[in-house]
């Protein structure tokens, strides 16, 4: 996973649900990013048992509350190095990425601030709650791989 750029890792962090129109992806999520992320996506699907159908449901705005989906979201964070030594989400890369995209900056900062406060539970529950919250507050910047 070391070959991934910070931009890729950041987009993957953001990529835990829907875009503006359900089922579409943000313009900055390229086909190349999706291709590079595929090995991690496949590994996390295998590890957690989440189905492609469940992932697609989230992309379409249907939030299923199954444990496999919740743990899949945390697995993505973990595999892309977005979890610190306390096994908590590290948002520095995400914030740095969006500093270069002024159209999204304030929206992203607000969503992160609000969602970090309300997310809780174990790692899987935290990832799911944060992702769902973020998707609701910044749908333009979010997509689930």
Task: Indicate where each model-derived feature is located.
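Cleavable N-terminal signal peptides of Sec/SRP-targeted secreted and luminal proteins
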Residues: 3-22
